[in-house]
């Protein structure tokens, strides 16, 4: 009885104190700050970078390369962290991200920058997935809402500081003899070193190592499946969607998907993404919703800053601040929904409301035009932010709650992985659609009577002709007379910095054409989010657990110890009743030596 009591006392002791949890969260926030700050800095500075490196048309490669590698790396980090612990993998992720940042800061062209951004993505995959997995380890599902404010504060701070820093760097010619925009990447180094120091000092999470094979074949098949499909999404408009190269990409991608499914089935529990997870209807539906919402979320976050800079003439810094309605909407709805979930344990309604608000926001964007004020776009951003705040954490929470404690890491990374797939596809497809539409929409804008009248008036104005700011656009107009509006539209695939400084009458057809092309991608996003809205009604909400993964593991161990002790005591008691001796802890009965001897027959007289 004494032994049983001891086991119970140890198991009921707190796994982590509140102070320890806070220090762990500080370490996680440092890593997440590094990742979120990088995204806001790069996003608002991309136009300046693309103009300087003469490659706006391939800027999608810079974004897509980052998303491809971060997407592929995400489930690998999740599986390896289940095997070797979260801490070493999180440290590796930060280190890789810093190396990629240093290399990106010295890129000489857009292709080189895309390659180094891909290296950054290998680290970012861990920075995005592991904090959520660690939160799943140390906090019960209903308790996590109490700590969401810390992470939202980090996200909000980086969202405000990032555009400001990015705009200052992008607008500076040189800082310490280095091009200003290069500091967009180099600034990660001091921040990353500080984050690494915090993680090394405070991030210590209990871990039980499991001997499971690493699914390298699964990782290889993911690469084979994703890369060609994303390449054709980016290059399809130039190759032709039915060209030989496009068909080859479709075929290789399909074979990769088939190979991945077969590999995961053969690997069983050791799979990169165990297929047993999809036996849960909650996990399966949350995964589908994550893909669709990721498509809309990343598409919006990457295209809206470009729209604000090109059409509304905002600087990179201004475009970052103009995105604040989306960030504020996300914070408000996330905090509110998190507190409600923590108190009630119910979450089914939030994906429904969230996707509905996102759909309303994208529908709002379909009315965008070159003559609409900036505040019009801010209204749509607020709606999208209010929707996102109710969806993202809720879907992750549902995925984590649908699996056992041992699968928290792989479930979290899988949830992030599929959301990243949606985001990667969204960016590649939406940018492809955008630049495919631009030549046609600009050609149509040049046929507008008001635009033609403005061009004619500007062409007869001596001041306009003499102003050096108009030289680039006048040259394009002169060269475009032979090729028509479509050839003029191709000019937006390169340097666009001349548009905001040119005479408004000369720039009007270009800006109107770009705005109309952007409306097309918002219709596409709206269609995708509406599908998510309909599917969200079918998300089965399972009751939230009251214990964290670590507490459940400790409880399971306590139960196992008690069962073993009870079995041993029962065997001892039974042996005592039989007058036998029992070897302690085994439950086996040791019979006296005399009882094992064969009795000798009696001699008859």
Regions inferred by a protein language model and the residue ranges of each:
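Hydrophobic transmembrane-helix bundles of small-molecule transporters
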Residues: 171-289, 296, 314, 321, ...
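Small-residue-rich alpha-helical segments with characteristic i,i+4
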Residues: 128, 145-156, 300, 306, ...
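Small-residue (Gly/Pro/Ala) motifs that create kinks and tight helix-helix packing interfaces
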Residues: 46, 161-170, 305, 337, ...
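Juxtamembrane helix-start motifs in multi-pass secondary transporters
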Residues: 86-92, 349-351, 521
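Helix-loop-helix hairpins in multi-pass membrane proteins, especially solute transporters
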Residues: 81-218, 244, 328
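Transmembrane core module of solute transporters
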Residues: 20-73, 114, 217, 239-410, ...
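Transmembrane-helix exit segments and adjacent C-terminal regions of multi-pass membrane proteins
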Residues: 1-24, 28, 262, 462-605
């Amino acid at each position: 009885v004494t032994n049983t009591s001891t086991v119970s006392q140890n198991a009921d002791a707190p796994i982590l104190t509140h102070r320890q949890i806070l220090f762990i969260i500080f370490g996680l926030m440092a890593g997440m700050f590094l990742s979120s700050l990088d995204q806001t800095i790069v996003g608002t500075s991309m136009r300046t970078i693309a103009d300087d490196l003469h490659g706006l048309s391939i800027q999608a490669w810079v974004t897509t390369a980052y998303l491809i590698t971060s997407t592929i790396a995400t489930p690998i980090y999740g599986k390896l962290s289940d095997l070797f612990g979260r801490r070493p993998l999180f440290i590796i992720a930060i280190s890789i991200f810093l190396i990629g940042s240093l290399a990106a800061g010295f890129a000489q062209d857009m292709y080189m920058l895309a390659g180094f951004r891909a290296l950054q993505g290998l680290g970012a995959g861990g920075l995005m997935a592991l904090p959520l997995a660690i939160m799943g380890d140390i906090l019960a599902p209903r308790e996590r809402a109490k700590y969401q404010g810390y992470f939202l504060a980090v996200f909000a701070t980086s969202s405000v500081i990032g555009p400001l820093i990015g705009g200052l760097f992008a607008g500076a010619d040189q800082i310490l003899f280095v091009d200003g925009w290069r500091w967009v990447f180099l600034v990660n180094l001091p921040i990353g070193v500080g984050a690494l120091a915090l993680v090394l000092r405070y991030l210590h999470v209990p871990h039980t190592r499991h001997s499971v094979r690493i699914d390298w074949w699964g990782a290889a098949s993911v690469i084979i499946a994703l890369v060609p499909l994303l390449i054709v999404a980016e290059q399809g408009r130039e190759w032709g969607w039915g060209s030989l190269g496009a068909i080859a990409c479709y075929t290789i991608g399909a074979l990769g998907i088939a190979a991945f499914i077969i590999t995961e089935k053969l690997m069983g529990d050791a799979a990169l993404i165990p297929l047993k997870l999809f036996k849960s209807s909650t996990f399966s539906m949350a995964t589908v919703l994550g893909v669709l919402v990721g498509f809309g979320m990343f598409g919006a976050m990457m295209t809206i800053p470009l729209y604000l800079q090109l059409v509304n003439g905002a600087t990179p810094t201004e475009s970052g601040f103009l995105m604040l309605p989306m960030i504020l909407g996300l914070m408000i709805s996330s905090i509110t929904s998190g507190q409600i979930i923590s108190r009630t344990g119910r979450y089914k309604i939030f994906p429904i409301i969230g996707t509905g608000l996102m759909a309303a926001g994208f529908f709002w964007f379909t009315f965008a035009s070159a003559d609409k004020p900036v505040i019009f776009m801010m209204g749509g951003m607020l709606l999208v932010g209010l929707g996102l705040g109710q969806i993202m954490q809720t879907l992750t929470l549902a995925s984590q709650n649908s699996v056992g404690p041992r699968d928290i890491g792989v479930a979290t990374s899988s949830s992030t992985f599929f959301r990243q797939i949606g985001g990667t596809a969204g960016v590649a497809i939406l940018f492809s659609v955008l630049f495919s539409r631009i030549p046609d929409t600009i050609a149509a804008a040049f046929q507008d009577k008001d635009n033609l009248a403005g061009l004619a008036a500007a062409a007869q104005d001596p001041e306009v002709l003499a102003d050096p700011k108009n030289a680039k656009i006048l040259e394009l107009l002169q060269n475009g007379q032979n090729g028509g509006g479509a050839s003029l539209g191709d000019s937006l695939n390169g340097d666009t910095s001349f548009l905001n400084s040119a005479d408004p009458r000369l720039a009007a057809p270009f800006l109107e054409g770009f705005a109309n092309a952007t409306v097309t991608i918002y219709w596409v996003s709206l269609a995708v989010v509406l599908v998510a809205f309909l599917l969200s009604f079918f998300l089965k909400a399972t009751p939230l657990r009251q214990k964290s993964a670590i507490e459940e593991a400790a409880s399971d161990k306590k139960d196992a110890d008690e069962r073993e002790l009870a079995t041993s005591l029962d065997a001892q008691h039974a042996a005592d009743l039989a007058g036998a001796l029992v070897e302690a802890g085994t439950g086996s009965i040791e019979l006296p030596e005399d009882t094992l001897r064969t009795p000798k027959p009696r001699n008859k007289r």
